[in-house]
Amino acid sequence: MAADSSRVYRRLMALEPRAQSLCAWQGKVLRNTLSAGSEPEQVQELGRLGSSYRHLCTLSGVSTDVLDECRNQYHDTAREMAFVLHKQAQRLKRLATYQLAAQVYREFLGTFEGEKASVEVAFYLAECLWQIAALSPASDTIRWSEAAEQYTRVIHLDPAGRFVKEAAYAAVLAWQNALYLDDDDLKRRPATTL
């Protein structure tokens, strides 16, 4: 039943790409996928909801109420999905689930970075990137550098915020891992800048 419903909504979206109901239709496809689809499918449909929102923003004549409703649905669903995937990844210690959570965090930040909640989301993205680096079979400089850069970004987003101390400490450790330094290396070669 959900698959049939989703097929109908997809057909409507293909026939009427400028309809004000575009986001509502994609939201229903996403809801169907959340109840019956795999995690990668859910993340894909969330991305499509984001694309629908961004597309509606470019159209003229779309009512403010429709845009606000679409924005709120996308914002809330993306944030909640990222948190759920992150918690599940922590429980299962699955690299693939951390990667999906990171993808959704990035999706959220790509649209809502300037918002108050974005600092928390940015921090949790950094946490996911740390775990991705730690769990990857071939942990390398690039993965650890991504985590370090994201922690550093959290510090810049809110220098007096609640995540600063933990982000600063984690950034130092991630850079240390990226550079393959242990404590003895640090004693022999002190860093000139941080």
What residue spans do the PLM features occupy?
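Acidic, polar-rich low-complexity tracts and alpha-helical solenoid repeat scaffolds
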Residues: 1-194
